[in-house]
Amino acid sequence: MSRSSSSMATVLVVLMVVSAGGLSPPCAAAAKEEKPVVVLPPAAAPGEAPSADAAAFVRSCCDTALQADRDGSSFCYYHLLPYAAFFEGNQVKVAEVAATILSTNLWVYVDQLRKVQGGAGKGDPNLNACVDDFSVAAGENITREALQSLGRLAAAGNGKRSKEDLENAQKWIKGVEKPYNGGIGKASGCEIGYLFTYSDDLPAQKTLGYTFDTASSLINHIKL
């Protein structure tokens, strides 16, 4: 090969390397935060009532799980009634749908917190802590694992359910509960009660407690 041909080949190799590098994302680029992908079963159409047996089953599940909380039981019932036809007498399916709804509402709430964080709540350390804690609680990996575990528990049936799957779901719901109890880490100052200042900008907070109690109570009533 001539010197000129060799030089040309070298230039082409360099160009190919540079071009390939230009097509790749920079190493320092931050990974995009992903929200968990959750799918609810079809809900009844507005005005469409479930069968009496299906409605009675939802009522029974809610009354049993939230027997000491009449308001919570009522919220649970009307919250889950649109999915009554899906449950087919399976209590774990009820818990699975409640958890799916909670995970969706958590991300709505986190989005609202972040908007306040960039506006009226800028510089508020308690708000910052709550954003951090609820973001961790609603994280993609732990949420996906919990919902997958609930799906397996629902499919397995009584006496065949995995203790590990139940523990995964319980671990997730305990993680969601932590921001209500003063934060996740020792240095965290998340106190949800102090967020009342921003209540007009946090509409999801109005029902988040009931949504959490519904999912938590139903998950903790799952029998292996």
Swiss-Prot record:
Its main location: secreted. One of its GO terms (molecular function) is enzyme inhibitor activity. Residues 1-30 form the signal peptide. The keyword Transferase does not apply. The keyword Glycoprotein applies. It is found in: Secreted. One of its GO terms (cellular component) is plant-type cell wall. Transmembrane segments: none annotated. Glycans are attached at residue 141. Keywords: Glycoprotein, Secreted, Signal. GO terms for biological process: plant-type cell wall modification. This is Uncharacterized protein Os08g0218700/LOC_Os08g12160. It comes from Oryza sativa subsp. japonica.
